[in-house]
């Protein structure tokens, strides 16, 4: 019974909804019928004659004033639309039409099944947009004290934004702290230091953490003088304090390397002890996870120091050993550091081997992966590539593979070619990047531009082919070719990550909506007509009469019909009628 009652209510509801959909037509005819019946009591004929008499007595100045007022209102609407579009990137009228008027006009289906499907689709798209707009730590980030601060001293500009540094502070708290830090005074101080906004306060806290360890060791060594050496080593120095000093206080890469080596000694000891105790409880397991992150970070930064100081082969060996020792820690993206170092050594076979492992469909892509693969493909044909020869004979198989690799890379990140071709100036890369965004393009080109220049003809091939990508994806925000549609959120996130003095690259270029252009043209044309009519009323009257005569003439109608038929023939490509045999000779 309950199911029958529910079905009857649903049918009744659908009937009511259907009747309300078409009820306005009934109301319209009822109103017309009432007006016709009440035309005599309401004196509709007299009122219409009065209105026509009033309109006949109006002077041209009234129409000029009316036209000017409408032009003024249209101009105000245009200015508001332009401001709203510049600020929010969309048309206000289009947004109101889609968001509010379309549901009222029946553009949204109220069916429950459709709602459930749309909600599932929205959740999938939201999940995809969140993953695409995730901010990643730059695997090739520079050193604050030795590189970023030196840039500030020379130019007076801040290369890092507050948002970028705040993300780094969150990363440091995630990697270098754990719940048991309050049990050790030095770690408790460093836990507060990572939250400090003032760089000098962070550096002072790091020195304080090291001094506390020194004081404790001096006090406790006499108490355990008769014990073994292993017991004396139970008071290690604070590795995270050395990390902070190497990152922010050291003014050269050599000084940073010395501090990282001291951090390595302290971090390695902590890692070995926590490795033995990790199975004793969740607290020890969290501490071991923290010590692992600290050790991996130190070794990676030591390899980057060696790369900066010209010891590239040593850096490659350290990175390979680190990837073998900790294969599951992919959050640091050490393979991108390895690819850059191998390209510096021109070890292209080793680069191809690394790409074969990480350029997989199941793994997340990056500009380094895609553009390095394109560089290797271009290297095989770039020295002999010529646009003129390719246009005459066509592309060979190797050239086609290189062009497809470039198109794939450009589709993933369309901002990179402008930096590689030096069409746009480079800045120091941020500490965090947004994949497929301008920040990732800067980070890639900053380190890989020299590798592209080293391969003869690679930049020429890129210059000749990269713009062809956009013909394959005419609507990149809606549908991609080899990747997901280009995320809309990149511009907003890049403006937060990149400094204000850098002009953020926007893709695709925002074009003014047709409504704004149409309103601007109509407003300008109407205002011009109103001004000319006010200044030269007789001349404009003659001109208007002449235009009306032209449009109403028979010759114009015949010409318009002929032009329409010619366009139809061009569209349909109708072949001409064959000539008679008598006229072929």
Curated annotation (Swiss-Prot):
Main location: membrane
GO annotations of cellular component type: membrane
Transmembrane parts of this sequence: 15-35, 62-82, 512-532
Protein name: Suppressor of tumorigenicity 7 protein
Glycosylation sites: 47
Membrane-topology annotation of the record: Multi-pass membrane protein
Keyword Transmembrane helix included in the entry's annotation: yes
Subcellular location: Membrane
Family: Belongs to the ST7 family.
Residue(s) carrying Phosphoserine: 386
Pfam family, one: ST7
Function summary: May act as a tumor suppressor.
Alphabetized UniProt keyword annotations: Glycoprotein, Membrane, Phosphoprotein, Transmembrane, Transmembrane helix
Lineage: Eukaryota, Metazoa, Chordata, Craniata, Vertebrata
